[in-house]
């Protein structure tokens, strides 16, 4: 993991903050996110779950809905500085969370299929590829009004 520089320019090791899943998303609060015409799935972010940690990680709940109505719910993080994504927990039908088995960070690819993380990283959360675009209200506004952060 890359080290960070403090205000004096000294290197310090990056430390990930603990991430606890938020309240389960309410269907009426979800913000649709346009990911790709190549996918028949629909993607949503729960605005109440968005946080920007002191560790530079944007955490959020992603809901993926298939055309048949099946849903996958996951609590995730994107680390802007390293272009990585991580799963913290997965939603259950009863509204509870199950911790992810692997706590590994994964490189975010921007490809035609399964590109939701690439879209969130480049268009909404980390346009400069170094740090989050702003606090949760800025991210929420951009998601709601379809304004990518690259404008």
For each predicted feature, which ranges?
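N-terminal secretory-pathway/extracellular module detecting exported/lumenal segments
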Residues: 1-151
């Amino acid at each position: 993991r890359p080290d960070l520089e403090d205000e004096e320019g000294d290197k310090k090791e990056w430390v990930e903050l603990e991430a606890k899943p938020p309240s389960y998303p309410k269907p009426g609060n979800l913000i649709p996110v346009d990911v790709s015409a190549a996918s028949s799935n629909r993607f949503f972010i729960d605005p109440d779950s968005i946080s920007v940690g002191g560790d530079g990680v944007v955490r959020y709940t992603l809901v993926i809905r298939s055309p048949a109505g099946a849903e996958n719910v996951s609590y995730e993080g994107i680390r802007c500085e390293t272009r990585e994504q991580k799963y913290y927990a997965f939603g259950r039908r009863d509204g509870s969370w199950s911790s992810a088995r692997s706590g590994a960070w994964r490189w975010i690819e921007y490809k035609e299929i399964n590109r939701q993380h690439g879209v969130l990283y480049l268009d909404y959360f980390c346009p400069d590829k170094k740090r989050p675009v702003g606090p949760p209200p800025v991210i929420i506004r951009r998601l709601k009004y379809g304004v990518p952060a690259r404008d």
